[in-house]
Amino acid sequence: METLGALLVLEFLLLSPVEAQQATEHRLKPWLVGLAAVVGFLFIVYLVLLANRLWCSKARAEDEEETTFRMESNLYQDQSEDKREKKEAKEKEEKRKKEKKTAKEGESNLGLDLEEKEPGDHERAKSTVM
């Protein structure tokens, strides 16, 4: 309460002389007022972004710690498995590229494969009659 009372006393002491002053008015040009408004707005945005970065930095650091724990490799894992997995992935990639290339060229045997795998309706009918 003492600080509030002290602020009120200072306000009354400082405001009365300010109102009594009679100086010539010095107005800023309109473009300078606009420039000051834009600079003030950008400064406020900068402060808000800075506060946001500081506020959210702790949560981000905790997330990074969790990911490092998850990313630690198993020391007892067999390295040959990794090599095998890489080789299989490479083979799949080559196979996929080859399929893309044949699809572009129009040399696909997908229709023949389907006919060989699934017997037609007339073949099913023949097998059921016999």
From Swiss-Prot:
Location, primary (coarse class): membrane
Classification via InterPro entries: PDZK1IP1/SMIM24 (IPR031627)
Stretch list, region Disordered: 62-130
Membrane topology: Single-pass membrane protein
Compartment(s): Membrane
Stretches that traverse the bilayer: 31-51
Cysteine pairs bridged by disulfides in the record: none
A GO CC term attached to the entry: membrane
Source species, domain of life: Eukaryota
Keywords assigned by UniProt, alphabetized: Membrane, Signal, Transmembrane, Transmembrane helix
Bias (Basic and acidic residues): 80-107, 117-130
Pfam families: MAP17
Coiled coil: none
Signal sequence, start to end: 1-20
Sequence similarity: Belongs to the PDZK1-interacting protein 1/SMIM24 family.
PANTHER family found in the cross-reference section: MEMBRANE-ASSOCIATED PROTEIN MAP17, SMALL INTEGRAL MEMBRANE PROTEIN 24
Protein's recorded name: Small integral membrane protein 24
Originating organism: Homo sapiens (Human)
The gene coding this protein: SMIM24
